Amino acid sequence: MRMVRQLAEALARLSGLRAAGQLDQAAEELDAAFASLGGIDPRLAREADAGLLLSLVQDPSRREALLRLLEERDRLRAARG
């Protein structure tokens, strides 16, 4: 349950930063979330294919968190153009 709360908080922060146009800060927040919630090195998370990243995570809760973070990664990329 703790991970769900942490994920919700991280996604809310990311959404707020993205909406405010603070894209660099959103990217930093996303990196931190990939490491703490997804268990993935942020450098890998920035570059790797979603399918590969999801295959690296066995825990269902972490996999779900990673999926949500990958969706946010795509939104951030779209916001950057």
Model feature map: region roles:
Residues 1-66:
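N-terminal alpha-helical interaction modules that lie
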Residues 7, 14, 67, 71-81:
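Conserved small-residue packing positions in alpha-helical repeats and bundles
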